[in-house]
Each structure stands twice: as C-alpha cells, then as structure tokens.
Curated annotation (Swiss-Prot):
<dbReference type="GO" id="GO:0007338">
    <property type="term" value="P:single fertilization"/>
</dbReference>
<protein>
    <recommendedName>
        <fullName>Egg-lysin</fullName>
    </recommendedName>
</protein>
<dbReference type="InterPro" id="IPR035916">
    <property type="entry name" value="Egg_lysin_sf"/>
</dbReference>
<feature type="signal peptide">
    <location>
        <begin position="1"/>
        <end position="18"/>
    </location>
</feature>
<dbReference type="GO" id="GO:0043160">
    <property type="term" value="C:acrosomal lumen"/>
</dbReference>
<comment type="function">
    <text>Creates a 3 um hole in the egg vitelline layer through which the sperm passes. Does not have enzyme activity. Species-specific interaction between the sperm protein lysin and the egg protein VERL exposes a basic surface on lysin that may dissociate the egg vitelline layer via electrostatic repulsion. Plays a role in ensuring species-specific fertilization.</text>
</comment>
<keyword id="KW-0278">Fertilization</keyword>
<dbReference type="Pfam" id="PF01303">
    <property type="entry name" value="Egg_lysin"/>
</dbReference>
<keyword id="KW-0968">Cytoplasmic vesicle</keyword>
<dbReference type="InterPro" id="IPR001379">
    <property type="entry name" value="Egg_lysin"/>
</dbReference>
<keyword id="KW-0732">Signal</keyword>
<comment type="subunit">
    <text>Monomer. Homodimer. Molecules associate into dimers and then rapidly dissociate again. Interacts (as a monomer) with the egg vitelline layer protein VERL (via VERL repeats); each VERL chain can bind multiple copies of lysin.</text>
</comment>
Length: 156
C-alpha cells in the first residue's frame, strides 16, 4: 500500500512538473551524455540525502535509509524525459554543439535545484517509507551510470 501511494505521488509530481496532460515527446542523447547526466543528478540527490539524514534521519533504520537512496534513483528515472525537455532548451541556447562537460554541468544543476528534502520529509512524516525489497536493492547496487532510463531510441 505504501509503495502504491509512493507511485501515485510520483505520478502526480510528474504531471505537476510537466505542466501538461499530454505525452512528453522523447528526446534521445548519446550514451556519453546520458552517463554524465545520470552521474551528476544522482550525486546531487545523494548529497541532499546525506545532509537530510544528518539533520532528520535519527529515527530511521538502515533499511529505511536504503529506501531513500532508492527514491533518488527512481525519481530520476521517473522524471528523465522532463529533464530532457529542459536540457534540450539549455543545450540549444549554447549556440554550439554540446560536449560532455555541458551535460555534467546541467546534471549537477538538476541535482542541486530539485528539493528532494521535501519528498524525504513527506515520506518520513507520513510513515510511508516502504519495506526494502529485492528490486530496490538491485537498483541501489547499480552504479549511477548503469541506472536504466528511457533513452533508447527503438528506431536506431
């Protein structure tokens, strides 16, 4: 039940962030750019989580902490295409072809700007942190660059 509510909350946040009720056209980027984005986004989210745990995580056990790391990765997966809308806008504004460093900077900005502390507080205060399950462990054990996202163009 808790996981269902978490998924519904993520879906509502997706709709709120996208500000539209239509399909978000998929944007595809090269693997090197994808890796740079994922590493920086997850690093930013994890830094936020470490700070949040230091201030608010006293009542959480080890498995609940691991679930919050899972929330970071799942949040990135859920919102990947919305990030791509913003990233395409930013890379087009450069006036030159983007390089990996540009994508690293954009990923770091996403990881820094999104207030994940709000979600951690929401889950903790409403006792909605789900049990730590095997699929969460599999995603947490992946390196950030290996976390799957919707970036594979089926036509290529």
């Amino acid at each position: 039940m808790k996981l269902l509510v978490l998924c519904v909350f993520a879906m509502m946040a997706t709709l709120a962030v996208s500000r539209r009720y239509q399909f978000v056209q998929h944007q595809y980027i090269r693997k090197a750019f994808e890796v740079a984005l994922k590493v920086e986004i997850i690093a930013g989210f994890d830094r936020t989580l470490v700070k949040w745990l230091r201030n608010h995580g006293r009542g959480l056990n080890e498995n609940q902490r691991k679930v919050l790391y899972f929330v970071n990765r799942r949040y990135m997966q859920t919102h990947w295409q919305n990030y791509m809308l913003w990233i395409v806008k930013k890379t087009n504004a450069l006036g030159r072809p983007p390089v990996v460093a540009d994508y690293r900077a954009l990923g770091a900005e996403i990881g820094r700007r999104i207030d994940m502390g709000y979600f951690y507080n929401f889950l903790k205060n409403r006792v909605m942190i789900p049990k730590y399950l095997p699929y969460m462990r599999r995603l947490n054990n992946m390196r950030p660059e290996d976390v799957p996202v919707a970036n594979r163009n089926p036509g290529k």
